[in-house]
Amino acid sequence: MSFNLEDTLESDWVAVRPNVFEEKERRKFVFIVAWNEVEGKFAITCHNRTAQRQRSADKAGGRSPARQQQRDSPAQSPARKAREEPEEGEEEECSWAGLFSFQDLRAVHQQLCSVSSELEPCLPTFPEEPSGVWSVLFGPSELSEAEVEDLGRQLRLYLGHALDTSGWKILSQVLFADSDDPEEYYQSLSELRHKGYEEGLQRARKRLQELLEKHKTTEVMVDLLDLYQLEDEAYSNVVEATTELYQYLLQPFRDMRELAMLRRQQIKISIENDYLGPRRIESLKKEDADWQKKAHMAVLSIQDLTVKYFEITARAQKAVFDRMRGDQKKFGKTAWAAAVERVEKLQYGVAKETLQLMRAKEICLEQKKHALKDQMQSLQGGTEAIAVLDELEADYYDHQLQLYEVQFEILKCEELLLTAQLESIKRQISEKTDEVVYYDTYESMEAMLATEDMAASIHIQRVELQKLQQKVRQLEAKRGRISAKKAYLRNKKEICIAKHSEKIQQRLHSDEGYRAAQLKQEKQEDEEERKSTWVSQERQKTLDRLRTFKQRHPGQVVLKSTRLRFSHERRRSTIRTTSSTDAPQSLSVSIQTQGLSDLGDTEVLQPIKTQKPETTTQLEDSSLPPNAITSELPLMTSLPTFTHEKLEPEISTLQPSSLPASPPPPPPPLPPPPPPPLPPSKQDTDTLEIRVIHVKKETEEKDGAKPVSGPLAQLFDSSQLLNARKTLKKTGALEGIQRRRVSSPMDEVLASLKRGSFHLKKVEQRALPPFPDEDESNNILAQIRKGVKLKKVQKEALRESFTLLPDTDPLTRSIHEALRRIKEASPESEDEEESLPCTDWEN
C-alpha cells in the first residue's frame, strides 16, 4: 500500500488492525447446550472456568482475617486503592447465554467458515424448518428426545472445535456480541502511515547493522572499500527514513504553531481596529492567552522531536565511524591511505551531527529554565510557597548544570570540527609540498623560469599554499577562542556549584536553627509548666498548713483595727521629728582643684544634712564652678592658699565653735600630686605664647548678691568665693603653660579635644602653575579639580531599581533572593558570549 496517496483517495481505504483477534493467554471454556421447547430453539450457555476459579480463589482469600485486615489497613497507599477499585468494578464476565434456531446456527456456521474452512463439514445436520404458509398451518416439526440429545451433543462438539480453530474472540463476537464497535477492529490511516514510517526506519537500520557486521570477516582493502560505499548508501537511507518519520511527526505541531500565531495576529488586529466592549476585549485576551499557550506547547514538542531526530542520526554516524576506526588497526599506513579521506569526512560528520544534537538540547534546557523562572515569579502566597520556591530553585540549578555540560560539549564538538579541518588542510599542504613534478630539460634554471607557462604554474602553487596556510592560522585562532570559552564555562560552572552548595548549607543551618529554637521554646514551656506546677503545689501546701493551724488553734487570731494603726504611726512620727530638731546642724563642703584637662568642669558643694534645701541650692549657684569632685570632710573647709612655687592646693581646717565636737568618719585619700615640671629655658620663655581659653560660665550676679541664711552664711563670704575662683583660674592657666612646655603636639591636640575647643588656622589655597607643554586633558589633577559630569537617570530606570527593592513579604523577598542567586550562577548574558571575536567557521 502506498503512503503518498491524497486525502481524497485515502477516504476510500480502510485499514484493519493487525493481530486484532490474537489472544494473550489460553482460557478454558465449557459449552452447555439444551433444547428449549417453549421457544423451539437451542439454549447455548458458555462458562469461563478460568475466570470462575480466580474469582472463587479471590473470595476465599478475601474471607481470611489476615487478608481482610491487610485490605482494610489505613496504611495502604491511596494510589493502590484507586488502582484496585476499577479492577474490582470491571470484573471479567464468566458466563454467556443465548437462544439459537436452526437458521441462526447455519448463519453462524457460514461466518465461522469464512474465517476457517476446516469447519465446513463439522456442522451437524439440522431438520428442515417449514417456511411460508406451511409453517403457519402445520407448525414446526416435533423432534424426539433422542434426536434432541444427539443434536445437542453434536452441537457441543462443533462449538468446541470452532473454539480451537477460530479462537475465543471471533467465536464470542459471532455468538454473543450485541453490537460491533468498528474502532476495535479498524485503524486510522494516520496511525497506519506512522507505523509504515517506523517500519521503514527499522528496515534501514537493520540493513546498516548487517553491513557493519560484515567488517569482521573482511580482510582485503578492496572489498572493504566496496563495503564502505554500501555503508554510505545504507546510512543515507537511515537518514532519509528518519527524516520522513520525524517530518510526519512534526507536521501537526507546525500546523498548530502557525495556526496559533495566525489567530493571535487576528485577535490583535481586532482589538486595535474594532470598536469592542470591555467584555469582548477581555474574552479576546483570554483567547489570545490560550493560543499563546498552545503555540508554546507546540514549540516544546517540536524541540523534543528535533532532539530525538539528531540522537538517531548521530548514533548511526558514530557507529559507522567507530567501525572504521577499528578497521584502521588491521591495515598498514600505505594501504590505509586510500581510506584517509573517508575517515576525515566521517569525523567531520560525527562532530557536526553531535553539535546539532547538543544545540537542540541547549534550546530545550533554555526553555525549561525560562519556564522555571516564570513559575518562580508567578508564585502566590501560601503555606507551602517557600518549599515550592526552594524546589524550583533546586530544579533550576540542576538544569543550569546540565546546560553547562551541554555547552561544554558544544565547544568540544566545535573544536573537533576545527581539528578535522586543520588535519585535512595540513594533509593537503603536505601533499602539495611533497608532490613530485617532472619538467622538460633546460640548460639552466633561468631558462626554465623564462617560459610563461612554467612561471604561471609555480606562481599558482605558491598562491594556493599561501591560502591554505592563512586558513590554518585562522582555524588556529578560532581554536584558541574556543579554549578561552571553555575556561569561562568551567569557571561559571564552579560558581554555580558553589552557589548551590551555599544554598544547601544555608538551608541546613536554617533547619538546624529552627530545630534549636523549637527545642529551646519547648524547654522554656516545660520549665514554665514545671514552675507553675511547683507554685500551685506550694500554694496548696500553704493552704493546707493554714487550714490545719486554724483547726488546731481556733479563736486565737487577734487583728488590730485601722484606727489603732493610724494612732501608732502618728506617735512614731512625732518622736522622730523631736529627735531631728534636737540634733545639731552641720554642713561640710569640699573644694578640689582640677588640672587643665578638667578646667571646664564644674565644682559642686554638697551638704550632708540640711533643713532648708532652697538655701543650699542658692549657695551652690553662687559658689565655685559646678561638676567638681566632692568628698565629705569631717570639719569645715576654708579657702586654699596658692603660691607660684607650689601648684598643689593646700587645705586648711577651720573649726568654728558652733560645730559639734564628735569627730565624723575620716575623709578619703587625696589623689597623688603631679610630677614637678622641668625648668624652662630662656628661649622657650621668650618665644612662649600663652593662650588663655575663656570658658563661658553661666553665673548669675543676683544669686551671688543674695544673702545666705542660716549657718551657711557664717561659713563663706562672697569676697572669699571670688578670690578662690580667681586663684583657681590662675592655677589652671599656669599649670597649662607648664604642660605645654613638656608635651608633644599630639598631647595638645588631645587636650584641646578634652576641652572641646579647636584652633584652626586658615590656609590660603595655592594654585599650581600649569606646565607649559602639557595639555589640560592629560593632567589628572586638573581633571579632578574640574569634577565629573553626572548623567541624568531616566525615570524608567529609577522605577525598575525601586521595583527590585526588598519587599516586606517573606515570599517576595525569597523570590528576589532566588532570582539574584540564579543570575549570579547563570552566564551574564548571551551577548557577552557573542561579543567574543569569533566568526562562524566555513563548511
Curated annotation (Swiss-Prot):
Residues 562-574 have a biased composition (Basic residues). It is a lipid-anchor. One of its GO terms (cellular component) is cytoplasmic vesicle. It is found in: Nucleus; Cytoplasmic vesicle; Cytoplasm, Cytoskeleton; Endomembrane system. Signal peptide: none annotated. Residues 776-793 form the WH2 domain. GO terms for molecular function: actin binding; microtubule binding. InterPro entries: JMY/WHAMM, JMY/WHAMM_N, WH2_dom. It comes from the Eukaryota. Pfam families: JMY, WHAMM-JMY_N. Residues 661-680 have a biased composition (Pro residues). Acts both as a nuclear p53/TP53-cofactor and a cytoplasmic regulator of actin dynamics depending on conditions. In nucleus, acts as a cofactor that increases p53/TP53 response. Increases p53/TP53-dependent transcription and apoptosis, suggesting an important role in p53/TP53 stress response such as DNA damage. In cytoplasm, acts as a nucleation-promoting factor for both branched and unbranched actin filaments. Activates the Arp2/3 complex to induce branched actin filament networks. Also catalyzes actin polymerization in the absence of Arp2/3, creating unbranched filaments. PANTHER family: JUNCTION-MEDIATING AND -REGULATORY PROTEIN, P300 TRANSCRIPTIONAL COFACTOR JMY-RELATED. This is Junction-mediating and -regulatory protein. It comes from Xenopus tropicalis (Western clawed frog).
